[in-house]
């Protein structure tokens, strides 16, 4: 079966790397995720990654506790680089040539983010892991994912969620009558105020015609199923469902 998408960006939360611990980095968990990503990559799909840093640091609570917000956000960016390096190492162990590019230069451990270089890596079948957000405070890793996806001309952003199998009209953990959407448009997401991504990220995705697929990453094989076009999770696009 031919993949639905040829070039994707996978957005992982930092907590996804923590496993059952909830904080820190659990290497077996990272290896499990890397194995699945490597299998999809080996099917011929070009892949980039953005990983959050919430397993190591959260800037907003630190700022609320009195820390300077800019410094708190920069600290969080460094956390995303740690996650990127660990994931890149695991991907390399599965035989996938991988590069880490950071928005804040730190050439001893990673390449600086250069769009043209990132595109060349993808064209040469390397996975690129983007770290340090966009290099500026006040911007989330969701916005980073949308911006980088637009820059590398990705067809879709795969929002891999922990235990969440899509987008609902209410919190399914609190409302037994919550209804899951199979398809939505970017406009509907913004109008309904659905908190899939922040508003900036949603707008970038809409303006650049990038599909957004929200799915449960805890089920093995789901990344491959999304890439092959199976109906799992929720797909957000500019096309209204028929």
From Swiss-Prot:
GO CC aspect terms: cytoplasm
Disulphide bond pairs: none
GO biological process, one term: 'de novo' CTP biosynthetic process
Functional pathway: Pyrimidine metabolism; CTP biosynthesis via de novo pathway; UDP from UMP (UMPK route): step 1/1
Molecular function per GO: ATP binding; UMP kinase activity
Activity control mechanisms: Allosterically activated by GTP. Inhibited by UTP.
UniProt main location, coarse: cytoplasm
Subcellular location: Cytoplasm
Binding residues for ATP: 11-14, 54, 58, 162, 168, 171
Description of how the protein assembles with itself and partners: Homohexamer.
The protein's name: Uridylate kinase
Organism name: Streptococcus agalactiae serotype III (strain NEM316)
Top-level taxonomy: Bacteria, Bacillati, Bacillota, Bacilli, Lactobacillales
């Amino acid at each position: 079966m031919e993949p639905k998408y040829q070039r994707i960006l996978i957005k992982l939360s930092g907590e996804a790397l923590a496993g059952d611990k909830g904080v820190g980095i659990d290497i077996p968990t990272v290896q499990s995720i890397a194995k699945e990503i490597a299998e999809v990559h080996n099917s011929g799909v070009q892949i980039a990654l953005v990983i959050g840093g919430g397993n190591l640091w959260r800037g907003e609570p630190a700022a609320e506790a009195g820390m300077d917000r800019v410094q708190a956000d920069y600290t969080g960016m460094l956390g995303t680089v740690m996650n990127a390096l660990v994931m890149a190492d695991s991907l390399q162990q599965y035989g996938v040539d991988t590069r880490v590019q950071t928005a804040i230069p730190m050439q001893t451990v990673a390449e600086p983010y250069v769009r043209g270089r990132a595109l060349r890596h993808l064209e040469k079948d390397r996975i690129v892991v983007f770290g340090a957000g966009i290099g500026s405070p006040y911007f989330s890793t969701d916005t980073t994912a949308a911006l980088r996806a637009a820059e590398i001309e990705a067809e879709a952003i795969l929002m891999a969620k922990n235990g969440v199998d899509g987008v609902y009209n209410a919190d399914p953990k609190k409302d037994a009558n919550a209804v899951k959407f199979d398809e939505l448009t970017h406009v509907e997401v913004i109008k309904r105020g659905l908190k899939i991504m922040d508003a900036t990220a949603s707008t970038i995705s809409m303006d650049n015609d990038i599909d957004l697929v929200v799915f449960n990453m805890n089920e093995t094989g789901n990344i491959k199923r999304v890439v092959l076009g199976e109906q799992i999770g929720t797909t957000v696009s500019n096309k209204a469902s028929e």
